[in-house]
Amino acid sequence: DTGHQTYVHKLLTGRNSEFDGLRQPGEISGYPSRAESSHDWIENSHASTVLAYAHGLATADATRGGSRRVVAVIGDGSMTGGMAFEGLNNLGHSGLKVTIVLNDNGRSYAPTVGRLSESLIRIRSNPTYMRRQRRLEDIAESLPWVGELLERSISATKAALRDMFEPTAFFEALGVHYLGPFDGHDIAEIEDALRNAAEFDGPVVVHLLTQTVRGHVPAE
């Protein structure tokens, strides 16, 4: 979602040598462009459009008898837009295989409003939840004889805690499964979450908590 955030995608799909000409006449676009690369499946500029694109791509694949899972990445600010809500509603109704990666970093050009935004803020502003989750997992790994049993117990506890947060009810009411929140800076955890999401037949939200430009102290 939000096409001007496509720069890293362009760098990873063979256009790094052309980057000096970004947004210049006759050079590469600052947005996804299907005419520019076969890796650009959609063309969008500003926010809340990607779920509609995902619905269209998944519908086209299913119509042709395919079984591919479409993955859409959207920020918490864009998720509060009306078009995103419409896309969620359509995906939940259709039951299509779409994974929605919700990149929740608390950033948008203007303050977000509404119940979903308030719920995401409450989770993001409660670092204790993530710290306690990590501490329990570390303890489980350090106890070889009870580790497996404790890990199963922790997984059940984490699921119960997540069900207490409003986003779960919001997405599930629309027919979209919800997984999370997860540490968006833990690659192994993200990979596990995406593998789990792929096991569902219908649409799934994978909620990642991230910090913009993390690791670059002057920008943090």
Describe each region flagged by the PLM:
Residues 92-98, 108:
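Extended low-complexity acidic/polar segments
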Residues 56, 72-73, 100-102, 206-208:
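Structural beta-sheet core signal
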Residues 1, 98-103:
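Short internal beta-strands
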Residues 69, 97, 203:
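Broad gene-expression machinery/nucleic-acid interaction feature
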Residues 1-94:
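Cofactor-binding active-site loop characterized by glycine-rich and histidine/acidic residues
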